[in-house]
């Protein structure tokens, strides 16, 4: 049996479509036929050679939902349900070792020293080869955390849980205060930013403000009920800051969430906060040029600045549950549905910020 795959062979080059033999499934592993695969902003960073974790060649794609085709042994999901052929599942993109200092002692597996990530640091040359979701089939290894999905779930919408959803949930773990009545500003209108904005709204934030440069993403934000959308390129930094201070009676935002993926957003984000506010850096996933930061502004305002790195099973599970309850909102985030053969065109749309969430639904 063969699988169609899209392989990155060289940085800054289009993905190459191939047909390859499906190898023997490792013990405890699953062969899964993709039903839907998400295209993520970090896929662009990978293609541009900005992520030092990435080996070549590689099948990209770390967000996926699919149907179990083959099981080598017994496999249970995170809820203890034994999996069978034909089950629909979603999987946690990161596979942790369960043995390192961060897994066993600190008990923060998202910091695992040996974390393997489908579609990010798993080479196409590494057995069992089919280790990314830009593929007709993917092979999930024994320690992969999966959740069996209901037949009623919108599978295309559910792919959002696998990366941006789980990472946003992780970020909200650091908010000690109740958001009821608060103002939350989200920098960046991609899936990570939109998921964060939706979480803030459903946790009681009075004002949710989204700063984004994409007209398409503004349309999506309005559909999901964001209170104020500021189009970045229509206002100067000073004007954007004033807009936030105007809706907070001159005090600034309680929480600001960086979801742009760019260091340049951080200096503005700190200025948007009230005294004692919290800044969550969620979108920075690759090394970038250094930027100047006024640490006096941080200390004199007694700010909490928290980095957020990926997610683990706890966040993944919550993201799946949240989407199950609010499918109608997250469905609005999907602006393009494409075939695997159209992946390079889809990546171009994403790079040009002409798309919200892109989902591959035809393989």
Segments (PLM) and residue ranges:
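Mid-domain Rossmann-like dinucleotide-binding core that forms the NAD(H)/NADP(H) cofactor-binding site
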Residues: 136-137, 150-234
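Glycine-rich phosphate-binding loop and adjacent beta-alpha segment
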Residues: 205, 222, 227, 262-325, ...
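Local beta-strand N-terminus motif with an aromatic residue
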Residues: 181, 226, 252-253, 343
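Glycine-rich beta-strand-centered segment in the early N-terminal region that forms part
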Residues: 23-37, 51-104, 131, 150-151
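Short amphipathic alpha-helix with an adjacent loop that forms part of the alpha/beta core around
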Residues: 237-249
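A generic alpha-to-beta junction signature in SAM-dependent methyltransferases
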Residues: 178, 248, 260, 273-274
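C-terminal hydrophobic helical "lid"/dimerization subdomain
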Residues: 1, 255, 267-271, 313-363
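Cysteine-cluster motifs in flexible loop/terminal segments that predominantly coordinate metals
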Residues: 40, 92-144
């Amino acid at each position: 049996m063969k699988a169609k795959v899209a392989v990155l062979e060289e940085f800054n080059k289009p993905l190459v479509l191939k047909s390859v033999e499906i190898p023997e499934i490792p013990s405890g592993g699953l062969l899964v036929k993709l039903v839907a695969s998400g295209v993520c902003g970090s896929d662009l960073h990978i293609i541009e050679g900005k992520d030092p974790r990435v080996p070549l060649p590689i099948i990209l794609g770390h967000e996926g939902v699919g149907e179990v085709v083959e099981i080598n042994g017994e496999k249970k999901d995170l809820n203890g349900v034994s999996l069978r052929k034909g089950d629909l599942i979603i999987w946690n993109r990161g596979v942790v070792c369960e043995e390192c200092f961060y897994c066993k002692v600190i008990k923060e597996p998202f910091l695992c020293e040996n974390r393997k990530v489908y579609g990010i640091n798993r080479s196409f040359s590494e057995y069992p080869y089919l280790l990314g979701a830009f593929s007709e089939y993917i092979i999930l290894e024994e320690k992969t955390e999966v959740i069996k999905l209901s037949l009623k779930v919108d599978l295309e919408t559910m792919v959002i849980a696998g990366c941006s959803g789980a990472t946003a949930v992780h970020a909200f773990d650091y908010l000690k205060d109740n958001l009821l009545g608060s103002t939350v500003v989200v920098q960046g209108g991609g899936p990570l930013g939109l998921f964060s904005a939706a979480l803030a709204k459903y946790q009681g934030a009075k004002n949710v403000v989204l700063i984004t440069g994409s007209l398409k993403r503004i349309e999506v934000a309005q559909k999901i009920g964001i209170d104020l959308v500021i189009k970045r390129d229509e206002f100067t930094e000073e004007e954007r800051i004033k807009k936030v201070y105007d809706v907070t009676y001159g005090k600034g935002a309680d929480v600001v969430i960086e979801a742009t993926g760019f260091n340049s957003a951080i200096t503005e984000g700190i200025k948007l906060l009230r005294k004692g506010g919290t800044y969550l850096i969620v979108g920075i996933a690759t090394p970038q040029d250094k930027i100047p930061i006024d640490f006096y502004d941080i200390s004199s305002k007694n700010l909490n600045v928290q980095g957020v790195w990926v997610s683990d099973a706890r966040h993944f599970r919550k993201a799946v549950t949240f989407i199950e309850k609010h499918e109608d909102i997250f469905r609005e985030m999907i602006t393009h549905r494409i075939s695997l053969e159209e992946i390079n065109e889809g990546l171009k749309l994403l790079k040009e910020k002409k798309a919200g969430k892109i989902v591959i639904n035809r393989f």
